[in-house]
Amino acid sequence: IIGTALAIAMIMVIVITLRATIAPFAPETHRDRMLIFRFAGLQSKSNVNWQSNGPIGYNTAKACFKAMTIPEAVSITNIWQETMLAAKPAGEMESCSVLQTDDAFWKIFEFEFLSGKPYDNADFDAGAAKAVISEDMARRLFGTSEVVGKTFLLNHSAYIVCGVVRPVSKLAKYAYAQVWIPLSSTSAFTATWGDDNIMGMTAVYILAKSKDDFPAIRQEADRLRAIFMAGHPNFDLLYRGQPDTYFVAAQRYSANNPPAVKEAVRQYILTLLVLLIVPAVNLSGLTLSRMRKRISEIGVRKAFGAPRRELMMQVLSENMLYSLFGGILGLVLSYVAAFLLGGMLFSVDFVSNGGEDLRTMCVDLLFDPTVFLLAFLACFLLNLLSAAIPAWRVTRTNIVDAINER
């Protein structure tokens, strides 16, 4: 039972971790239709040894991606969330995570608005000092979630709350924040670096109408890049295979290194195989040992005419019960592990948001009966095979040898 439980628990933890990387959940509901562009390389045409790597500027992103016609929506945001200080009405300061976005951000990511609405295109073009805040941040700042129309200070700049959304899990790493403000209301809107002001601090998120449009979207992105770079004849802008699908983007850890996609897939497959095969071998040995202790009982039953098939079915039915109890225990253990080891498993810090972030994570990712049933089925089949082989060997033992435990 313990062997089955540990196998199922470990498999579920691995699958939950993988699901957090690729499976859609609010507000990143459309992960399967998303393409992501976060880093580029700027290569000098006159000096092959000169190259800059990193995010691109807003104007570059706008010229190379906003003009696209094939996608459903294109959003430009600050590439990373920033930690800022929000001032309560009484003057106390509260640290919060802030993401600067455009208005199309709210079309790509599906937030649950509890009150108010997001800032729109007119607000973005005007650089309006409006903010969408999470429910938990609203309570921390104002003591209530009914805060639409109220003003607070964000890094000493006044912002008006235009909407309140349900808290977001940090596992939604591209949509997560506690406060969302227009990119055009901050200096990040015009921030650039490098030659010709091509590089900056923005990321691009593209929502395709269908996954089948991905090749056409990449071709259109290359065409727009060529048009933009015609005005910068001294440089090449390197996309390095981007925009990426969500899974590939999760494996891209730096601007100038390719994502290790094959290695990641190979690692997941190898881990799952080890988690399945090792317990199966152990269970086979345990079953054979248990059967040898009952060999005299089997010999007596065979002497009284018990058919081999009946003895086999008894052993297999007992193993089914072990698998069932082990599966239930494994399910419980996997949830306990996800709660206790969440920060390590998902590479996020749950301390700042406490149980609220764990709750939003668990509702969307942990309690999925399909994942459990698949893991349980895999372990059950292996347990069945691991029990069938020793049972077949023992039931073929000669009656006299079985009674004499030989």
Across the structure, where does each feature detected by a protein language model lie?
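A hydrophobic alpha-helix feature that marks transmembrane segments and, especially
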Residues: 271-298, 311, 385, 390
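Hydrophobic alpha-helical interface/terminus motif in multipass membrane transporters
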Residues: 17-21, 286, 291, 298-300, ...
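Short, strongly hydrophobic transmembrane alpha-helices
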Residues: 1-23, 327
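Structured, solvent-exposed hinge/loop segments at the ends of secondary-structure elements
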Residues: 15-145, 153-159, 343, 347-357
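Transmembrane alpha-helical interface segments in multi-pass membrane proteins
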Residues: 2-3, 7, 296-342, 374, ...
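C-terminal membrane-exit region of the final transmembrane helix in multipass inner-membrane proteins
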Residues: 24, 368-406
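Mid-to-C-terminal secondary-structure elements
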Residues: 102-118, 129-258
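Membrane-helix entry/capping segments
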Residues: 227-271, 293, 341-372
